[in-house]
């Protein structure tokens, strides 16, 4: 009480270190989320390319399977065989040998199609999971950005109020 003149002195020095720490933490979180989001987006694009390629390969194999099934069906059609008028040796070469080769190729292509279908399902699941992760990260990032913006706005508002109070106190004093 150096001045005992009855005046009251108000000092309003608001400590903004908590706000600065929180803002710094939010900035770090935003930076980390941006990095993760960028990485996941790259993964998604890569998965999308792989999924497209695998789907196209499976479709092509499916078409080959359909053609081979028709071929095997035709080579088993007695009416068609009789209409061709094959001799015994021609029948052996034109029907039996071709049918055996077509059936073997059909089995191979069906096995390949099964493998490709599994790969498409696996890639599709990974793509969906990555998309969900990206959506989740985007929501978190948006929330962090909003929180940082609000914190900055609140800190700025508090600073202006403090300046106004200090100015009013200076005028009153």
Residue positions per predicted region:
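Residues at a specific register/face of alpha-helical coiled-coils
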Residues: 2-91, 95-173
């Amino acid at each position: 009480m150096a001045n005992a003149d009855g005046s009251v002195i108000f000092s309003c020095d608001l400590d903004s270190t908590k706000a600065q720490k929180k803002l710094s933490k939010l900035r770090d979180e935003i930076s980390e989320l941006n990095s993760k989001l960028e990485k996941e987006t790259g993964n998604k694009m890569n998965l999308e390319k792989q999924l497209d390629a695998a789907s196209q390969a499976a479709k092509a194999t499916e078409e080959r399977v359909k053609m081979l099934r028709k071929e095997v069906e035709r080579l088993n059609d007695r009416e068609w065989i009789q209409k061709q008028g094959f001799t015994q040796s021609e029948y052996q070469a034109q029907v039996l040998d071709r049918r055996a080769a077509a059936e073997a190729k059909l089995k191979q292509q069906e096995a390949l199609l099964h493998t490709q279908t599994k790969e498409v399902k696996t890639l599709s699941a990974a793509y969906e999971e990555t998309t969900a992760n990206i959506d989740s990260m985007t929501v978190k990032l948006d929330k962090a950005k909003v929180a940082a913006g609000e914190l900055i706005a609140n800190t700025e508002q508090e600073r202006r109020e403090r300046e106004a109070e200090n100015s009013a106190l200076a005028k009153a004093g």
